[in-house]
Amino acid sequence: MAYVLTETAAGYALLKASDKKIYKSSSLIEDLNTVEKVTEQFKIHRFEKFSSAANALEEANAIIEGRISDNLKKMLEDVKNDKKATLIVSEAKLGNAINKLGLNFSVVSDAASLDLHRAIKEFLPELLPGLDDSALKQMSLGLAHSMGRHKLKFSADKVDTMIVQAIALLDDLDKELNTYAMRCKEWYGWHFPELAKMITDSVAYARIILTMGIRSNAADTDLSEILPEEAEEQVKSAAEVSMGTEITDIDLENIKALAEQIVDFAAYREQLSNYLSSRMKAIAPNLTALVGELVGARLIAHSGSLTSLAKAPASTIQILGAEKALFRALKTKHDTPKYGLLYHASLVGQASGKNKGKIARVLAAKAAVALRYDSLAEDRDDSGDFGLSVRTKVESRLSALEGRDLRTTAKVIREQPKVDITEARAYNADADAPMADADSDDESETEEEPKKEKKDKKEKKDKKEKKDKKDKKRKREEDDEEEEEDSKKSKKEKKEKKEKKDKKEKKDKKEKKKEKK
């Protein structure tokens, strides 16, 4: 008898086929295109209902992984009693798992069985009593959502989309701040041109405008909160002899409005930078410890997500961000770039020009390991100790290349007990005793003996190596001589064969001439 195992969102259905060889007949399977034919061919033998949505999720995951659950095993015990029974399943992995149970029936899972399952699932509500189409759809939708959540294992702390958006906004803010600061300096420069030369910081420049207003107020304005004492005196003295033109109150209001925008943008940028730093430490702590928050965030944003970056090899991470230069180099057959976004990492910046490529390669290899630890490790440590330990290795490599100590990271020691500082014991000189001369002689002899033994061993080893070299050389010479002799013989034989052939040809020609005459 043929049985068909069908998995539904409601439970396991075991259908009994009226034709025991239906899975062998392609014409019969093709005819299963109406409700009447399907219900005529298959009857429900047993239906094992899932107890809850959680149970349905467990059973579905077991089937995907090719495992046999207790419910399914219990259900298959009924078929075991039917001798010469055939069980048709849709999944080959599931079929192999059922075969391992050692039940008294054969399991079939091939292309024809897939067509059979497709026909059954199309008219499944008609085959299962007590289940209508809408209820089955609702169960399927709920199970699909549960499986989706189970596979994704969603966690708000691990959403790398926040990093991608934050670093993009940070770059936009930097551009806006630079543009606004340039406009502000050009605008206020007509009134107080000397201020831009003395104050290079854009935020401090904007705060001075908001506090002081026109330059004539400089003498009565307290700028100690913004500038150090020396810089404050320079600004006040420059304001008295400034060559700038006068501006109206309306001009000053508009300049102050722009200065307020600069100060607000700078404050928001700082807050966004802190937010990005905290998100990077939560999502990729080891990458952050290795390359820094900004470089790490740019790498994640460039690849799209932390997972896709973790799956990339070290060679890809090394040149990430230099794609244009790479393809240009490949097209023109020039040298490919040695680094991309990693160029801005502090470790690469510390290296000299000739060593930047080497350090970028080492850093990319370590970053690939740190990324996989952050993204794919089951039981990971969010403290970033692994990243710090890897960074020390890169720093030691950099120090070796540069020829000077460039290590800045303290060595990471895990789970070490606190150090108890105790007073060191003083040296007791009274406990010293003079040693006899005989003892010293014995000690010198015992020290000389191992040295002599080492020397003898080294001499023996050197002699053996020399002998081996001589033997190899002699053997090589003999082989060369044999090869020369063989080549001479082969040449001689070829020459003799050629001469014989020429003589024979001449003889044949003479005989032909005689015959013609």
Curated annotation (Swiss-Prot):
Sequence ranges of Basic residues compositional bias: 454-475, 489-517
GO cellular component, one term: nucleolus
GO molecular function: snoRNA binding; snRNA binding
Every Nop domain range: 283-403
Region Disordered, annotated ranges: 423-517
Stored Gene3D superfamilies: 1.10.287.4070, Nop domain
The organism's place on the tree of life at top rank: Eukaryota
UniProt keyword annotations, A-Z: Coiled coil, Nucleus, Ribonucleoprotein, Ribosome biogenesis, rRNA processing
SMART domains linked: NOSIC
Protein location: Nucleus, Nucleolus
GO process terms (BP): box C/D sno(s)RNA 3'-end processing; endonucleolytic cleavage in 5'-ETS of tricistronic rRNA transcript (SSU-rRNA, 5.8S rRNA, LSU-rRNA); endonucleolytic cleavage in ITS1 to separate SSU-rRNA from 5.8S rRNA and LSU-rRNA from tricistronic rRNA transcript (SSU-rRNA, 5.8S rRNA, LSU-rRNA); endonucleolytic cleavage to generate mature 5'-end of SSU-rRNA from (SSU-rRNA, 5.8S rRNA, LSU-rRNA); protein localization to nucleolus; snoRNA guided rRNA 2'-O-methylation
Predominant place of localization: nucleus
Record field: compositional bias (Acidic residues): 438-448
Pfam families noted in UniProt: Nop, NOP5NT
Entry coiled-coil feature ranges: 456-517
Function noted in UniProt: Required for pre-18S rRNA processing. May bind microtubules.
Family, as annotated: Belongs to the NOP5/NOP56 family.
Name recorded for this polypeptide: Nucleolar protein 58
Gene assigned in the entry: NOP58
